Amino acid sequence: MKIAETEDGVVLEVFVRPRAKNFRIVADGDEIVIFCEEEPIKGKVNKEIVRELSKLLHRKVELLSGFTSKQKRLLIRDAGKSEIERVLLEQAG
């Protein structure tokens, strides 16, 4: 997993697949893949990712880069690396 701890929280690198049947997180080798229901129009996918990860992790989530790309970097505020890894692995099954 591409996760780095910073003084602000945890930076998470993900690959996004839009237009899925439901929102889900999958661990694919060393990569985290997030399947989103929304279409990649007018930031809908970005909003869905931030909203769903915030609910899942109970933390503030911000998009750092990848606003128009499938490769994204997210900041999860006030979180530890091990906590985020654990929750993501549980979700990824």
Question: Model-found features: residue ranges?
Answer:
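Beta-rich strand-turn-strand
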Residues: S54-R59
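Contiguous, often N-terminal, cationic amphipathic patches that form binding interfaces
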Residues: M1-V50, E62-T68, K72-G93
